[in-house]
């Protein structure tokens, strides 16, 4: 009898090679989310809403998360427009107890969670950190942009482990790779760099129970989170971006759909940059 081959990174996988999934032969079917349940934080507007609607268009039932902007009407819209089940949930992602409660509610209401997008985030708009008094603003960024992601991942990961499958997608940022100019935002950059590496780290840990973890790093996108930028700052953004403009939220959804669907069953630990080429030069 030949000796068993065991993984160096995940011995819990058992004897190698692992079994490949059975996939549809039609490429369009690979991108279908029919029969899946998706949960998207920060989805009352901006990137999160674009992703939630795209998932509904692909056939998924969708749980929308909001904090300050009620999204019940948007959930109703998804149901009426695309014939999927949709419901809005209010949650403060900086509160781990609230996160756990909402994720458990979603599992109860929908039966499970197959896809989770940790997207909620806030921007740093206070300039050079050395000029900021105290640590409240730092804590605000880290609590939402990093801790909130971890709280969501830690809780939904339990569901994925139970199901032996699942896809976690973390919205990171090109700011986790580069240092932004002309605006200075060290706390945001640090939080997003941590998000990118958290995704990579979890991808190795969660592979043992069949779940995948990836991140997406948008560049400058036309959403409310960028409203702090004045026209002169945006001109500099355009000059620094090879495509010469900001992106639309709809230009991101293809990457999210890929990572959510069976088109990406061999993709884990990846960070997809959708930044108009900003990080290339």
Swiss-Prot record:
GO terms for biological process: L-sorbose catabolic process. Signal peptide: none annotated. Coiled coil: none annotated. Its EC number is 1.1.1.289. The active site is at residues 173, 188, 192. InterPro entries: NAD(P)-bd_dom_sf, SDR_fam. NADP(+) binds at residues 47, 74, 119, 188, 192, 221, 223. Optimum pH is 6.2. Pfam families: adh_short_C2. One of its GO terms (molecular function) is oxidoreductase activity, acting on NAD(P)H, oxygen as acceptor. CDD domains: MDH-like_SDR_c (cd05352). Keywords: Carbohydrate metabolism, NADP, Oxidoreductase. Pathway: Carbohydrate degradation; L-sorbose degradation. It is an enzyme of class 1 (oxidoreductase). It comes from the Eukaryota. Belongs to the short-chain dehydrogenases/reductases (SDR) family. Homotetramer. Catalyzes the NADP dependent reduction of L-sorbose to D-glucitol. Can also convert fructose to mannitol, but less efficiently. This is Sorbose reductase SOU1. It comes from Candida albicans (strain SC5314 / ATCC MYA-2876) (Yeast). The lineage of its organism: Eukaryota, Fungi, Dikarya, Ascomycota, Saccharomycotina. The gene is SOU1.
